[in-house]
């Protein structure tokens, strides 16, 4: 793994670049987390909620129909869509709310794009009876209305953010501001592998259950490892969790799929690894989509969860080291894959995951029937059906 040093760096990426007012809170979080990782009661409690609340381990499914129709390699799915709340996000929120409880916090906040992290945060807020506030861009509130309703039903206050592009970046900025103002009683449950140290490490550790389970399950069924592992990448939490299980297996190729949007022009995609440059965003040093003056360029994706102009610092490290290959799929390709997976396999995937499916289709056709591709099915697509229907004008063929 791209093991971070004491300052929270992965190679040249990472670190802690935050306002002075957050320094003590970040140090407290780091110190508490280090202690809890060694605490038997914490580990037992986390395992209890993973098994009895989230429903882990999530299944490994052989996608027989996709394998037959696409041709080439066999397709396997790690079913994070079957977790409680419908995505991988609950893996992280359940862990972080236990940290918040250990620190004596009474209020939790979060940012969300597609709304799945917001729902997962609202869920643990309800279960642990903590005041919960979720920041969400107005554009994302429009295209992910179902999840906004779910959050409110769970008791969370949903705050629309209209600044900037009114998407994930802006929601994250507002959540950071809230945390700075209410740091004494509030824990910020960062939803992706982004932010100042120790957030990228904490999120990766809680999501690593995906890859650890996947490796064990796949080997048990096939008596070998997959040839390729594919996951979508926005900030990158589902991908970093999936890759964790295979990062030391050099023969397993790892692919991160970003959002190619509708063109390669600035402002029309979220392909940070391909088009980004080293910079600073939300408290970390990473690859960022920016102009020649260092200003953040607006990102775009048909998928709200991938609509982010940065990427987790560990992904930036894996790109630079060459261990993971990062590619991108455009909006239309993702929409096509969304409908195709529905029709062929009877699974409605999240639009985020649809990017991974589209790339897997192309890759599978370059491989033999004896080879295997494992896809992280990061979430279900109930939240996306209205937006897909709108974009395709009700035509699904």
Curated annotation (Swiss-Prot):
Biological processes, Gene Ontology terms: L-tryptophan biosynthetic process
Annotated pathway: Amino-acid biosynthesis; L-tryptophan biosynthesis; L-tryptophan from chorismate: step 5/5
- Give the EC number: 4.2.1.20
Does the record's keyword annotation contain Thylakoid?
no
Q: What catalytic activity is recorded? A: (1S,2R)-1-C-(indol-3-yl)glycerol 3-phosphate + L-serine = D-glyceraldehyde 3-phosphate + L-tryptophan + H2O
The alphabetized UniProt keywords are: Amino-acid biosynthesis, Aromatic amino acid biosynthesis, Lyase, Pyridoxal phosphate, Tryptophan biosynthesis
Question: EC top class, in one word?
Answer: lyase
- GO cellular component entries: cytoplasm
- Domain of life, per UniProt, equals Bacteria
Please name the GO terms that the record assigns under molecular function: tryptophan synthase activity
Name any cofactors this protein relies on.
pyridoxal 5'-phosphate
**Residues recorded with modification N6-(pyridoxal phosphate)lysine:** 89
CDD domains xref list: Trp-synth_B (cd06446)
Q: Which PANTHER family match?
A: TRYPTOPHAN SYNTHASE (PTHR48077:SF3), TRYPTOPHAN SYNTHASE-RELATED (PTHR48077)
Q: What binding partners and quaternary form does the record give? A: Tetramer of two alpha and two beta chains.
| Function, in words | The beta subunit is responsible for the synthesis of L-tryptophan from indole and L-serine.
Name used for this protein in its record: Tryptophan synthase beta chain
Taxonomic lineage of the native organism: Bacteria, Pseudomonadati, Spirochaetota, Spirochaetia, Leptospirales
